[in-house]
């Protein structure tokens, strides 16, 4: 699998998970409609399906995916919630992305 394709797939997977978790948050914490649970469930189903498209073992996929998830969550924080990430948020995301790169690009037996 091409590295750019895999990274794009990780980003799509993360967006599906963030949307699937953010919509119930809106209902539970901000008093929005419980009907938001319907698209939330759909988004989480898409998230689970997207995870199956990665070619490596499930545990390695989840570990590598975590780095991208952190970065996408911080972009969401900024663009959707209107809160600019701190320097420490960005440093933490960079460390997570470096960890993801080691997992994805490391040699296999």
UniProtKB/Swiss-Prot annotation:
HAMAP family in the record: UPF0060
Location in or out of the cell: Cell inner membrane
PANTHER family found in the cross-reference section: UPF0060 MEMBRANE PROTEIN YNFA
Family: Belongs to the UPF0060 family.
Highest taxon of the lineage: Bacteria
GO cellular component, one term: plasma membrane
UniProt protein name: UPF0060 membrane protein MXAN_4406
Stored Pfam families: UPF0060 (PF02694)
Organism: Myxococcus xanthus (strain DK1622)
The keyword Membrane is annotated on this UniProt entry: yes
Protein topology in the membrane: Multi-pass membrane protein
Keywords: Cell inner membrane, Cell membrane, Membrane, Transmembrane, Transmembrane helix
Membrane spanning stretches: 3-23, 33-53, 62-82, 87-107
């Amino acid at each position: 699998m091409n590295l750019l394709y895999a990274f794009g797939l990780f980003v799509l997977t993360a967006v599906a998970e963030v949307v699937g978790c953010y919509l119930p948050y809106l209902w539970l914490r901000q008093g929005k409609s419980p009907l938001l649970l319907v698209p939330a469930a759909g988004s989480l189903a898409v998230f689970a399906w997207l995870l199956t498209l990665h070619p490596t073992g499930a545990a390695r996929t989840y570990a590598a995916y975590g780095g991208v998830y952190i970065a996408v969550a911080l972009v969401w924080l900024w663009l959707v919630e209107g809160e600019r990430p701190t320097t420490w948020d960005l440093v933490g995301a960079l460390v997570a992305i470096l960890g993801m790169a080691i997992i994805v690009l490391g040699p296999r037996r």
